[in-house]
Amino acid sequence: MYRIESKIDTSSSEFKQNQEAMKNSIATLRERLGQVKLGGPEKSRTRHVERKKLLVRDRLEKLFDKNTPFLELSPLAGYDMYENQAPAAGMVTGVGVVHGREVLVVANDATVKGGTYFPMTIKKHVRAQEVAMENRLPCVYLVDSGGIFLPYQSGTFPDKEHFGRIFYNQARLSAMGIPQVAVVMGSCTAGGAYVPAMSDETVIVRQQGTIFIGGPPLVKAATGEEVTDEELGGADVHCRISGVADHYALNDEDAIKITRNIIENVVKEKKFELNRDEPEDPYYDPEEIYGVVPPDVRKPYDIREVIARIVDGSRFQEFKELYGQTIVTGFARIHGYPVGILGNNGVLFSESSMKAAHFIELCTIRKIPLVFLQNITGFIVGRQYEHGGIARDGAKMVHAVANADVPKLTVIVGGSYGAGNYGMCGRAYGPRLLWMWPNAKICVMGGEQAADVLATVKVKQLEKAGKKLTQEKIDEIRKPILDKYEQEASPYYSTARLWDDGVIDPAETRDLLGLGIAMSLNADIPDQKYGVFRM
């Protein structure tokens, strides 16, 4: 493959301005990540440690093989929500390595409101199980939770994707032959008791872990019986009497050793084999991305300059280079794995939509993972393009994305607006993982456009009533709309609500994509049942 010839002048003032803006954005990201990784308030953390319990991230460090990467999911879930009571939504999830195989972990943080479940905690737990299901990853649940956070109970209990979905997923995962292991390291109360009960194997820590459907206060209220936590559902009860738990651990460290032994004895399935080459660093420094990407998502730049800084050797075999030039498509390798890349270089026209559909079908039939680099304002609008069938041609691209059964990974590197989000494999189209850069924006349309549309509607309504607005009044209508769209288009607003799997440092994109591809190969890639339709 040919090496991309970069046209970026790294000594230019524009490059340095872009670089400074991105570094500031990354500093903000790191500060926010550092804060949520502390967990709950200092008082809660101190009390937790005084009880001889390991903090959640210390538990994970001991669980995983030394010097192996941890692909954390949604670390800023719940950010700036719930009056900031739930950093990381009170839970750590992600993909780590235990005895050489990738596992999906879901770990409650008991320093955050006793590990109770907020609505976003449930969404985060369910999303982690979805990742496990799609990629056939064994699940390890480090349980230390008081159940649902009752002030938000209406958003946690009865709906399809609420608390019950966790247990439904466990049953389905087990039926698929995907191991489920629970480690009870603290409270496991009410509905949460089904996590260990529905796991294939369960470990419980003595004098610390408890499992019961109804705790001592509820038992007394219902039956008049007075009983302690340990008498009702401690390790001795469940390992010696009920049989709910299978392994008796002396403390957190012992529980983790037992868990590692369990995973060691799980039959390791053979990964799907891609034709992998020896990994090669990009020819251009990935940190140069900071200076390539302007802080204003409305300002265009060549997506090839980003591709050159994430692919092996900066080599890229472009497909249909001279046709539909507002989308760049082509083949490359990331950490040795073959990938098909689609990146935006402007609005999507009929030609670029058909080109993308053709390329996606090529990758699907060849079983090559797809990487989408989103920087898209949407599909072209206007009389000429509607007459030319942009809706029909855009639908071809959407069909191709939806039906591509190869691993798909999406990175929002700039704007992600409207139907452009759909065509470029947004959350609804099943990417195995989706990340955002800290400069990115995600919205149904730009704030300026939304303000113009809503202001125009208001003006026409008043004109029909014989009234006319001054420009000052029109600006008053537009301002709250602009402010609202600016806030809600933020990557932090998105990631708090799990519209993505995390906001990331652009320089880490390549490594995260490599981890994502490696993870995805635990599942088979099915055969495509039809040929390639040339567009």
What are these regions (language model features)?
Residues 1-535:
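Ligand-binding clefts of soluble mixed alpha/beta catalytic domains
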